C-alpha cells in the first residue's frame, strides 16, 4: 500500500485537475449559449434559402442551371466541418466514422472522393488515415464569419463547375440539444428536390429579372455558402455542448476518485498508527 504522503499528493493533484475541468465546463457553458444564439439567428435564413432552392429544383425553369442537373458520378466532394480544439468527447470521431463509411460506399462503386476541410482536427485525422484534402481552413475561433469559409467553398464550386466533381456534400454535426448532437451528411449539389410532400404536387414557375442565368448563378452560390455557414455554426454549438458535458463528466469522475483515494489514505493512516502502537507495546514489553 502506498504511503500516506504519496496518497495526499495524488489527492491534491486530482483536486487541481478538478478545478481546471470545472472552470472549462463553465466556460463551455457560456460559449454554448452564445453559439446557440448565433445558430438561431442564422437558421431562418438558411431554412428559407433551402425552401426556395427546393422550389427551384421541382419547378419548370426556363433556364436549366448546371447545379440542377444530375450527372454520372465519377468523383464526389465533401466540405467537412470539424473542430479546432479537442476535449469535446466523441464529437469529431463520430463524424469522421460516418464520413469514412460514406466514402467507402462510394469507393466500392469506383467513385473517387475529394475533401475540403474546415477545422484542424479534421486535417490531422485525414492526414493520418489518408484522404485527398484539396482545401483547408483552420483557426476560425468562436466567432466564424462567412468570409472565413469562402476559400474551401470556392475551390469545391470551381471543381464542380469544371466537371471535376459530380456531387458535393457538407458534413457537420447537427445540434439537437445539449446532450445530443448528430453527425450529418447533406447533399448540396446537384440541388436536391424539396422533401416537402405538399411541394411535390405543385408546379412552380418563376419570372426572372433581368436575366435567369445571372440571377441563378448568384442565388445558387449564396445557397451553398449559407448551408456551409449554417453547418459551421451548428457544429460550433455542438462542440461547446459536447465539451461542457465532457468536462462535467471529468469533474464528477474526479470527485469519485478523490473519495476512493481518501478511503485508501484513511486505511494507510490507520495501518501506520497501528504499527506505531505495536512498536511502542513491543518496546515496553522488552523493558
From Swiss-Prot:
Q: Does the keyword Ion transport apply?
A: yes
List where in the cell it is found: Cell inner membrane
Topology in the membrane?
A: Peripheral membrane protein
Q: Does the keyword Transport apply?
A: yes
Q: What residue range is the signal peptide?
A: none
A single GO molecular function term of this UniProt record:
ATP binding
Tell me the keywords, alphabetical order: ATP synthesis, Cell inner membrane, Cell membrane, CF(1), Hydrogen ion transport, Ion transport, Membrane, Transport
Note one Pfam family from the annotation: ATP-synt
Q: Which InterPro entries match?
A: ATP_synth_F1_ATPase_gsu, ATP_synth_F1_gsu, ATP_synth_F1_gsu_CS
Taken from the UniProt entry, a GO cellular component term is: proton-transporting ATP synthase complex
What does the record list as GO biological process?
Answer: proton motive force-driven plasma membrane ATP synthesis
Q: Where does it mainly reside? A: membrane
Q: Which family does it belong to?
A: Belongs to the ATPase gamma chain family.
Q: State whether it acts alone or in a complex, and with which partners, per the record.
A: F-type ATPases have 2 components, CF(1) - the catalytic core - and CF(0) - the membrane proton channel. CF(1) has five subunits: alpha(3), beta(3), gamma(1), delta(1), epsilon(1). CF(0) has three main subunits: a, b and c.
Q: Which HAMAP family does the protein's record reference?
A: ATP_synth_gamma_bact
Cited function: Produces ATP from ADP in the presence of a proton gradient across the membrane. The gamma chain is believed to be important in regulating ATPase activity and the flow of protons through the CF(0) complex.
Q: What is this protein called?
A: ATP synthase gamma chain
Amino acid at each position: 500500500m502506498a504511503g500516506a504522503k504519496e496518497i495526499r499528493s495524488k489527492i491534491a493533484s486530482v483536486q487541481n485537475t478538478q478545478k481546471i475541468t470545472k472552470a472549462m465546463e463553465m466556460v463551455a457553458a457560456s460559449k454554448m449559449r452564445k453559439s446557440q444564439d448565433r445558430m438561431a439567428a442564422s437558421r431562418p435564413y438558411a431554412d428559407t434559402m433551402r425552401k426556395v432552392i427546393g422550389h427551384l429544383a421541382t419547378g419548370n425553369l426556363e433556364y436549366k442551371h448546371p447545379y440542377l442537373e444530375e450527372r454520372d458520378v465519377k468523383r464526389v466532394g465533401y466540405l467537412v466541418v470539424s473542430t479546432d480544439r479537442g476535449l469535446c468527447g466523441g464529437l469529431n470521431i463520430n463524424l469522421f466514422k460516418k464520413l469514412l463509411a460514406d466514402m467507402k460506399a462510394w469507393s466500392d462503386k469506383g467513385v473517387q472522393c475529394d475533401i475540403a476541410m474546415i477545422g484542424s482536427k479534421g486535417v490531422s485525422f485525414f492526414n493520418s488515415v489518408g484522404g485527398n484534402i484539396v482545401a483547408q481552413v483552420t483557426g476560425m475561433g468562436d466567432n466564424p464569419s462567412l468570409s472565413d469559409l469562402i476559400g474551401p467553398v470556392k475551390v469545391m464550386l470551381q471543381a464542380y463547375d469544371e466537371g471535376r466533381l459530380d456531387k458535393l456534400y457538407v458534413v457537420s454535426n447537427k445540434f439537437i440539444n445539449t446532450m445530443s448532437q448528430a453527425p450529418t451528411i447533406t447533399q448540396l449539389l446537384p440541388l436536391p428536390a424539396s422533401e416537402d410532400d405538399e411541394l411535390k404536387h405543385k408546379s412552380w414557375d418563376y419570372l426572372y429579372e433581368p436575366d435567369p442565368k445571372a440571377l441563378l448563378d448568384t442565388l445558387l452560390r449564396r445557397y451553398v455558402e449559407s448551408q456551409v455557414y449554417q453547418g459551421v455554426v451548428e457544429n460550433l454549438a455542438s462542440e461547446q455542448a459536447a465539451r461542457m458535458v465532457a468536462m462535467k463528466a471529468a469533474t464528477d469522475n474526479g470527485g469519485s476518485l478523490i473519495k476512493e483515494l481518501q478511503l485508501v489514505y484513511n486505511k494507510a493512516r490507520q495501518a501506520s498508527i497501528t504499527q506505531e502502537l505495536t512498536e511502542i507495546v513491543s518496546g515496553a514489553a522488552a523493558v
